Amino acid sequence: MAKDIFPRRPIQRPHASIEVDSSGIGGSASNSEKILCLIGKAEGGEPNTVYQVRNYAQAKSVFRSGELLDAIELAWGSNPQYTAGKILAMRVEDAKASQLEKGGLRVTSKIFGSVSNDIQVALEKNTITDSLRLRVVFQKDNYQEVFDNLGNIFSINYKGEGEKATFSVEKDKETQEAKRLVLKVDEKEVKAYELNGGAYSFTNEIITDINELPDFEAKLSPFGDKNLESRKLDEATDVDIKGKAVYVKAVFGDIENQTQYNQYVKFEQLPEQASEPSDVEVHAETESATVTATSKPKAIEPFELTKLSGGTNGEPPTSWSAKLEKFKNEGGYYIVPLTDRQSVHSEVATFVKNRSDAGEPMRAIVGGGTSETKEKLFGRQAILNNPRVALVANSGKFVMGNGRILQAPAYMVASAVAGLVSGLDIGESITFKPLFVNSLDKVYESEELDELNENGIITIEFVRNRMTTMFRIVDDVTTFPDKNDPVKSEMALGEANDFLVSELKILLEEQYIGTRTINTSASQIKDFVQSYLGRKKRDNEIQDFPPEDVQVIIEGNEARISLTIFPIRALKKISVSLVYRQQTLQA
């Protein structure tokens, strides 16, 4: 008797669990989104970050190139009739971003990998407006952008009869942020603006107020968005504004603001050398002392066009376990590791089993290398032997969107198969579904296909008849080839079971867990379950169910439900009995 409990991991807190007995059937059902997860090598993307991509252009902008991007293209294009929906993808290498420290700035690439070393940055003097001009160049993307008139935020002009007028920006010694803007006429304070929050947190608010003062005029710089947080203003002392408009400056604040949405670089202001701290304070207490040392930021100076450096792609780690954990609770269902390493396949098998046992059903599709022998494939299957893992045997060539021919090892073909199965309705089998392969490295004979299929290995066969030639998937077997338990040996039926029991579990928990038994009767729960199964039957997700077999018993604080379901099966065999007879013609 084959039984499976969902979730398998014992739970002591209030919950619902479902026991599935699949001994009465020999294996399928219908429609919902099955999110595909891919992990592999790429030229772009932040390490340890899972990206959700919905189209190829978006994927290319993130991952740039590499096996991961090719796998995404295969998942969406190996059979246009059935393509994956959104894809969750992550690069596996611990890549590093390039950097540049120059002119008082630290420039860090937002692109991770060696390609980021080709980004160039320059900070130049604009002598016409007494400001700075920033250039960012990345020739590989034909990108060049200029940020001009940086540093000038708003001007202040005093037009009154006083002999002297000045403004000052005072900084907090501890935070190194602007704290007060002070206007003076003839050494007398006219007004002081508190800049660390409150009514004058942004420069627009200061300008509005200054223009209400007699004989003062303030104007925002007309170049770009200059409405900065006022705490980012640069320090200034007694700047003469008698009869002339002089700019209040915020060089780094303006650079940071203008480039905040730049997709290539980000900026930090460097501190003065740590060996020469200023404003050292010691606060002694009875049993301890606190030492505070503040370094002023470096002055920002112009510098010539310079390349960033230090970006590296890194290598895939020996173990992918920590990387796989990033896909927890992301909502993925199928996951494909883009590697032929058996140790990683075992880690993926453990990962999907653990997630499924915890109540988040997942499945994996893995593949080997190029032109692997049957014996090696049998060895891979024997090590895996997992009802939640499928193994793809074939490697081959695909024509990609840009016209190039991709030599795809079996683990890349696995991404194409995963894209196909993700695009099918829940419980629909990939058996005999065509795959748009240009050629296979090894075309198996009929006996070999039978042998591989019986051992739980997915294969692709070449079909030629009078009307068409194509490549199609032989069967939807898992690496657990027990024909007596099709829920475990067939991908489609196992998938249908996952979605059916996980949805029923959630609905029962939402509807009944925590309710008082005086308000809940066995007949109510029975009606609820029958209604749910009736809906699934109408949606073609189950074949049928006997309503009289739905039984509910409530004893104490526990409800026990038993039911029988006839699943929708994928037709696997057709037998035709054909008899020829001789016709006698006479006249």
From Swiss-Prot:
It comes from Staphylococcus phage Twort (strain DSM 17442 / HER 48). It is found in: Virion; Host cytoplasm. Polymerizes as an extended structure around the baseplate-tail tube complex. During ejection, the sheath shifts to a contracted form, thereby making the inner tail tube protrude through the host cell envelope. The keyword Zinc-finger does not apply. Belongs to the myoviridae tail sheath protein family. GO terms for cellular component: host cell cytoplasm; virus tail, sheath. Its main location: virion. Signal peptide: none annotated. It holds the Pfam family Phage_sheath_1. Keywords: Host cytoplasm, Viral contractile tail ejection system, Viral genome ejection through host cell envelope, Viral penetration into host cytoplasm, Viral tail protein, Viral tail sheath protein, Virion, Virus entry into host cell. GO terms for biological process: symbiont genome ejection through host cell envelope, contractile tail mechanism. This is Tail sheath protein. Homomultimer.
